[in-house]
């Protein structure tokens, strides 16, 4: 498969290879290199999301390839109801992808968006990662689940008894997921990390992002008026310029 990018009448053709690790479909973007970025997408996204394509277009012109893959219940895996998109399953998948990268590359970096960043924090704290790039990251999943429980008037005891509850806004809460989050706090992240966060992000409070950035010495850029989902022409233009300055 090939994707053709057009810019100022100059064509850039990027080769994309499809492969699979167990039940995880992967895309490998660009010509063979010694360095690679692993991309972990966010909720309701997939391995070919527009923000991933933009990122791939930038880094494959440099010294990197990109590996992107579908999280459980996303992309090519959206119809698999046996293997759910829970933190423990995603950590398992991220570790498989990391092991693949270790076998094939000399240097590994990561790009992650939204809840994908949270899964990266859970999975890769002890890995040798040269650079981390986070777009609209979730860094405290417990706060998000607590908020959903409060909005739906669900207590921790009720969730424990019922094991899973479908909220009024369609999100299913799982006690084993919640327990995993509680038992695996983010206490270590000694990576060179750049974060792009929108000031109007309604998923993770700005104070939480600021505290995380200060605690782990991250380079934080706050885009005024930006949302959790970067999708407008202006937002994507800023995102692209930001990437070109940090990669």
Residue ranges, per PLM feature:
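The alpha/beta-hydrolase serine catalytic core
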Residues: 85, 128-211, 215-247
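Short beta-strand immediately N-terminal to the catalytic nucleophile in serine-hydrolase-like folds
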Residues: 110-112, 135
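Gly/Ala-rich beta-loop-alpha elbow adjacent to hydrolase catalytic centers
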Residues: 112-120
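N-terminal cap/lid segment of alpha/beta-hydrolase-fold proteins
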Residues: 3-32
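Catalytic nucleophile-loop/oxyanion-hole region of alpha/beta-hydrolase
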Residues: 75-104
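Conserved alpha/beta-hydrolase
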Residues: 56-78
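Short beta-strand element of the alpha/beta-hydrolase
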Residues: 34-42
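The serine-hydrolase catalytic nucleophile loop
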Residues: 44-56, 207
């Amino acid at each position: 498969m090939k994707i053709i990018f057009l810019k100022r009448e100059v064509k850039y053709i990027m080769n994309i290879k499809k492969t699979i690790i167990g039940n995880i479909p992967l895309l490998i973007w660009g010509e063979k290199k010694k360095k690679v970025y692993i991309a972990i997408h966010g909720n309701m996204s997939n391995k070919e999301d527009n923000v991933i394509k933009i990122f791939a277009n930038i880094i494959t012109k440099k010294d990197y390839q990109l590996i992107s893959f579908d999280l459980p219940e996303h992309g090519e895996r959206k119809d698999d109801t046996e293997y759910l998109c829970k933190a423990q399953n995603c950590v398992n998948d991220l570790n498989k992808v990391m092991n693949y990268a270790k076998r094939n590359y000399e240097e590994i970096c990561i790009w992650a968006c939204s809840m994908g960043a949270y899964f990266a924090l859970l999975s890769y704290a002890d890995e040798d990662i040269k650079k981390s790039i986070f777009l609209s990251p979730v860094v405290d999943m417990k706060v998000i689940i607590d908020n959903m429980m409060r909005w739906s008037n669900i207590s921790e005891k009720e969730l424990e008894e019922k094991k899973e509850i479908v909220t009024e806004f369609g999100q299913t809460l799982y006690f084993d997921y919640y327990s995993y989050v509680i038992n695996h706090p983010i206490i270590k992240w000694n990576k060179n990390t750049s974060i792009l966060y929108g000031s109007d992000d309604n998923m993770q409070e700005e104070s939480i992002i600021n505290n995380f950035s200060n605690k782990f010495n991250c380079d934080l850029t706050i885009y005024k008026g930006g949302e959790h989902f970067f999708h407008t022409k202006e937002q994507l233009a800023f995102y692209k310029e930001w990437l070109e300055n940090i990669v």
